[in-house]
Amino acid sequence: MAKTRVLLVDDDRELVRVLTIVLEDAGYEVLSAGDQHEALAAAARERPDAIVLDVMMPEGTEGFHVVWHLRRRPEPYFQNVPIVILTAIHSATPLRFYPDSTDGSYRAGEYLPVQGFVDKPVEPPALVAEVQRVLAAARAL
């Protein structure tokens, strides 16, 4: 049986290395991307079972823009793939991505079509638990 595949997107190579080990130890096959362009290409090419995506990406683009581009694609895969956001942004920090949000909180998940959030610095058990949770929820649909 094939392993569940997770696309891990972060420009911090050391963090990617560490989180890859964490996710592989939990039984996942890990694919990685270092920026939004690589993330979009890898998602289209590899069709991972889940995506773990950093908020602050290089070139001035937030990871939320990657979510926006993925969810705009018409194929059902892109509408349904579970996405977990990694973020060091505190909830009081306003984000441009939330034009309808009344409080600018990154936890206003109803304004963003993602399934989970994990705070940075990442606690490995929290990441594994969140990936397991979003995958289980996606399979239950």
Question: What is each model feature region?
Answer:
Residues 34-50:
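Acidic, metal-coordinating helix/loop segments flanking the phosphotransfer/catalytic sites
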Residues 13-31:
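Two-component/phosphorelay signaling modules centered on CheY-like receiver
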Residues 10:
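Conserved acidic carboxylate
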Residues 54-55:
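Active-site residues of response regulator receiver
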Residues 107, 120:
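A Lys-centered signature of the CheY-like receiver
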